Amino acid sequence: MNRLITILFLGITTIIMQAKTDKEQIETLYRDMYEDMVAKDTVTLNRVHADDFVLTHMTGMHQSKQEYIRAIANGTLNYYSAEHEQTEIKVSGNHATLTGRSRVTAAVFGGGRHTWHLQLTFQLVKRNGQWMFTNARASTY
């Protein structure tokens, strides 16, 4: 009986540690994504967004992964900095949801430079041991 309890305890502990590790990986991915947007690192952005990724802007406009990364590369979306205020991450197996609140300084779609209180809600999937963004919805807070 003691052996069974020990095995169950170790199994539960492993699951809890894995969930924490996943949350840490997702938090890092979120912060790094903003750094990559500022640096216009399209290679990394391409790697961390799934091929079927879709961004829904606060206006309701949808951008595919290719359109989104192209807009960053050509300056349609110019990101200058991001100060992260809050993240909430929920992990369920190989799927996760991240809601991040950041003060983002950007100039978008021909507008002037402005600091936005931007909330992004992401859906993520873990493929081959790596977390990827599959969907994002932008709003303000």
Regions found by a protein language model. Name each.
Residues 33, 44-45, 53, 68, ...:
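Hydrophobic pocket/interface hotspot
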Residues 37-38, 52-63, 74-78:
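A short gly/proline-enriched turn/hairpin at secondary-structure junctions
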Residues 4, 8-51:
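Short, low-complexity N-terminal intrinsically disordered segments enriched in polar/charged residues
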Residues 49, 59, 83, 88, ...:
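A mature extracytoplasmic/lumenal domain signature
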Residues 72-110:
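Surface-exposed, charged secondary-structure patches
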Residues 59-60, 109-113:
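Short, solvent-exposed loop/turn segments at secondary-structure boundaries
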Residues 117-141:
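Short beta-strand edge/turn micro-motifs at domain boundaries
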